[in-house]
């Protein structure tokens, strides 16, 4: 799809030379929808990669707007002479910072797959949403993808673009040709010049055609005289003050382009990446280097310590081009100099020790004659030349600057584009190295002047009106796909800017630190409110006792989260006439700050006068409006909110009808827009945590309702949606049952027969399954507590749907339909049974105010029934959602690696974190889920500590913050920390490499506290642990018996390093990068105050999504699951293009797209393209999710797999070592995903004949398989077989025989004695026995002859396996199975056919699309997450034969 024709706001992602993207001329900003909509430079990224195809790929002809071409340009890494370094080039073996990006199938002129047909199976799980809503434009794309052939082209909904070539001539640079399309704008050509190395230092210029300047926002097709071969000239323009400051900042950013301080400090969208520091350019020739393949000690199985130094890349020696470049204190130019063209004065300190004073005039920059003695702005006699570029001037006066700048630009050009693009939301690292602070006058100006907001040099007017921008983008047209893309991009960009402004400027530097004057300074500090940069800020305290009866400060803290959930819910509905405020919740230094956009006119009148809907006094009086009633009726239906009536509370005694909670306020702003705010009661309360509420019998048996710190606990939207869907299915089944009883007696008999057969099948599965049913039955019994539940006989869902469809069809046909009265009776029974508010249809809704005591409900409201429905929803969470989550963990449909992935998984199922204790109790005795228990308890303890830390840190002064935080960490992670006193000897004790002076300084700071609050120093390990235990019981109903944290962590198996990482992440502490040796068990002090590098903000906000792109992505996943890989690939590729046009080039959702594209490319026979896509996905995950996030670990494993497929063998091992290290760091050794990593490492080490190391990893993989998977699983058999081969290569045939016997036992039990796989294992046993006998004979012969020749005793045959056979085993371990088909069956039951894989090589890894699409996907419940399709499954033989086990699973990872 031609993105430029649809959005013109896409950030292009080809790997070329880019300048920093945080500062661009305002003229390069995209035309705003209204005059008050200024955007920063990131918005102005070019819309389409095809603009640069002549540079990147050297292509002249061909379509430039197809999605393939757009993505083709995204992965190219060019050398300085413009030649591509692909894995197939002879010179590609050199070390490089990124894997070589191969050509895509289109660039290689790829044709349809060859003659060999393959069926591809993935053994990973992925749960897809059950409902898929695709708009008409997406349906067109979906249909287009279905109709395409092997070329994979997807129809573009936009008009086709004419392409032509132009020549650009720039001062001081060689002319170059550029291929463009007619729909691009002139500003995109400006961006090309800012990205080229020869012109990247020019910012103030215009493009001219035949002497006429071109407008930035004019499309090329509208320029008269611009044709193929036209010449555009870059003409330097006069500087203004604004243009001069922009130019200086741009040069400063070029100079600092290698500086990592922004990434470490978490500013300007910068974040760290590790992948670029790894050498991925090696080839097969490096595989024999022992040094390259040997694992570091800290990743070996059994290594106890978790060093932190390897987490971050090794910092290179910084390249310093200058000492300082700053705005001169002689600014502004005096009047007489302004009249002569002076614009700005600068000072420049060189590395040679000289200072130059520089004047910027309208013509450019020159050195003036100013000295320390006085101001002389006239040109210097020794440097009279005026340079239009500041970079040229600095290079002419300083040789060291010129040399350093050349090196900086060279290294900058070697960086992958994804390393330099800003992330949409700031990603902070929890650990950081020490950086030496260097002079930076511009940074000092930005960060020390309280009146600056950081945007003055970027926008052409006053400070931004955030509310107007947010609401204007909301009102943009959305009828066509192109309009929706423009709108979604604008919404996303404005929102990300709003979040950045709320965090960067106002919280960390202003509100919490006291740098902003409150609008109510005379009030108590905790009630202060602020306005800064057109954003309203308030603290999360109970102001004026508004929440006194609901829990005080705890309720006020929870209300902000509930309010954000409501804003997110209404924003997703996207009602064009209903507006919500921009909202960001920031937690910083123990304070919660809420940032909101400001409704026009809200500050000009009293709140009582502004609110025309809802209540301003907590329900005592309520008002309503017909306008708001109409506006909220549809959202109430979508959000399952019950319209209800309440008393107005006024003397008139009116009854008011509400379509929301009474807390929701409706305000019409001065802009005539209808706003809703205070959405904290959008969803019904969680009665399990509402004291004195009436709950169901099952909930009572589980100890509910429980006392909670506040009364604002509410159910999540995901739970409401799941509950309503569950009740709808129940409604269908009940109605179908009554229809069956009334009219379809015969069908009932047939159905019962079918049900008996189904039950029989289920019984077989229970017998052969992996005790999952027994575990779930035990959990169900524990939940229900043997309470008898009255259940109506129900039909199975599919049978019920079939019956109801037949009834509906018969009604339409007016043939043999049910009597109308009978139908109404049936519907009424079903509706009553599920709690529907209507008797003639399904309509389940909740009254969010049914438990509110401050509002008086109308007598017509059935409050008892409404409360019962809310209680049943809370029971649904206990009875259905929690057990289903446990089942998903048992089936490994979700893979939890750390607390963040646990929280995401729980929230996606509507489970609140307060149920973490209940979940932990359910799984504490389930051995297969011991790793989940560790993650749950770690998260539980960290959240308890966070609750305490919040109140602990608030009263601490700024001077003692580091000391207080380090003391808290010492108390939390050790059992022997005592309160701090000035005489405490422990304070002055040196810790490891920490100097004594550091601790002495700390003691002085503590003792000099004087009148300041020093309660924090009285904390001790014992006090903190007792509070954590109490908090765990109070919040989570989880009991801890151990007397100290050391004993408890040891009992549960929690690493202190993992615990520290998770805690500092959720509270926003940045630690010093050093090895703390927490696992050594030392009793001394663990942390000192210098270990606390910084505190950063934790932000919660709405995350706008690319709706059309997401729908396409889900459609692509569905196609892949159906076996239509090419169609799925096309849809996912198109989805990536749409995301690119909405998000720009950097977003975590795009990383998921690229991961799926990489897998599909690999399966479709293009491993080089798979490597390219996976490399980008890994880089993006590191930047957007974090260096050690769960997603990043998975990306590393996939990248290692595809690197090995491209013969980057040593690189594959490095990536696997990195993945293993990260998993060790965030969790530890005992995790099922570690078995997968270790299996991969062991296989590759076996391939490079590192047998000793291979054994360590394979043995650990086997141990983990036996714990977390069924010991008789097929993957376990494969590990046994690999161990047998490895032992045999070491000459240990006795152990090898034992391993292969285990393989034989598993196969014989699974397949039977006569199965080919069992016979193959039997043959292997015979072969090993023969080798063992021969080996023993040689030993005996050597003993008899007294020979010391070790070479005679080596194993008889050690064949190095082919790389292809090793790759096949890796495929199996990573869930990708290739099956070669000798014939294509048209039968839907492929289980009836036998397909056998013969010997293959890498050149035969192509599949026919038709072969895949003709095969039906079939699943049954075999163990080890696999389903046997063929009756002749086989396991790969590492010695060279190339047979592959024939298995299948659900398609996606």
Swiss-Prot record:
SUPFAM superfamilies: Hypothetical protein c14orf129, hspc210 (SSF103107), TPR-like (SSF48452)
Ranges where the Clu domain occurs: 439-690
Keywords, ordered alphabetically: Cytoplasm, Repeat, TPR repeat
Family of the protein in this entry: Belongs to the CLU family.
Region (Disordered): 78-110, 979-1015
GO biological processes: intracellular distribution of mitochondria; mitochondrion organization
Location(s), subcellular: Cytoplasm
Compositionally biased intervals (Basic residues): 995-1005
Gene3D superfamilies: Hypothetical protein (hspc210), Tetratricopeptide repeat domain
Organism superkingdom: Eukaryota
Composition bias, Polar residues: 78-101
Pfam families: CLU (PF13236), CLU_N (PF15044), eIF3_p135 (PF12807), TPR_12 (PF13424)
Organism: Brugia malayi (Filarial nematode worm)
Protein name per UniProt: Clustered mitochondria protein homolog
Main function: mRNA-binding protein involved in proper cytoplasmic distribution of mitochondria.
